[in-house]
C-alpha cells in the first residue's frame, strides 16, 4: 500500500480521466461490459481470465465503457487487473469494488480508473456524499448503485448524477428485471440511469431502454462465453462496432 502522500501525488499525475458519464448517453445501446473472474453467487466464472486480452475485444465489439472487478476475496480481482485494462483500452474504465473509504477513491484514480462504484447500501449518507465530491474533484463521476426506493432517495439526496439500479438483491442474490422498471420513474431525467445485473438478451435492453434507461451493465453473461465479444454483439443488435 502506498503512503498517503505518494498515493495522492500518483492520482493527481495520472492524467485526465476519460468521460464515463458522456459515454453512457450516446444515442445507442450503451453497454458497460464487466470483466470479472468470479462472483459470490457463481464462484469461478472464467478460469482463463486475462482482462488485458479480453478488454480490446469487448471495446471492438461495441462496449461503451468497461467495468473491472478489483475486489480480491469474492471476485478474485485486483488493481493490477484495472491497470492492465486501462493500458490496452481507449474507452472509460470503472473500478468495481466494495468502496467504503476515501482512500479507495484515491487508489482508483492512481490506478487509472475513470469512474468507480459506490454501493449505497454499504455506506452511510456522510460517506456517500464525501466520496461523491472527492470523485468529482478527481474528474471521476461515480456510478451510485441502488436496489430500493429508499436507497434511490439517499443517492439523489447526496447528489448522484449516474444512478445504477442493481436488479440483484445482494442479500439473497435473487434477480428481478422488474426492480429497474419499478424505480425508473423516480430517477430524474437529468440523471444517467443504468440497469445492472440479470440482462440476458437484446430484448431486455430494448425493454429497459424504452422504459428510460440510458445504459446497461453486463458481466457474467459475457464472461462465461469463450469469446465474450460474440454475446456482446448479440446484445447490441445492429450496433456491433465501436465508432472510430
Positions of PLM-derived features:
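Catalytic cores of alpha/beta
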Residues: 100-111, 147-159, 195, 199-218, ...
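Glycine-rich phosphate-binding active-site loops on the catalytic face of alpha/beta enzymes
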Residues: 110-127, 165-173, 211-232
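Active-site-adjacent beta-strand anchor residues
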Residues: 75, 145, 194, 198, ...
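Short acidic, glycine/proline-enriched helix-loop-strand junctions
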Residues: 90-91, 139-140, 190-191, 235-237
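Catalytic-face loop-and-helix region of soluble metabolic enzyme cores
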Residues: 162-218
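An N-cap/entry alpha-helix motif that binds or orients negatively charged groups
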Residues: 1-48
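C-terminal helical cap(s) of enzyme catalytic domains, especially alpha/beta-barrels
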Residues: 182-186, 209, 222-244
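N-terminal active-site wall of soluble small-molecule enzyme domains
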Residues: 30, 35, 42-143, 149-154, ...
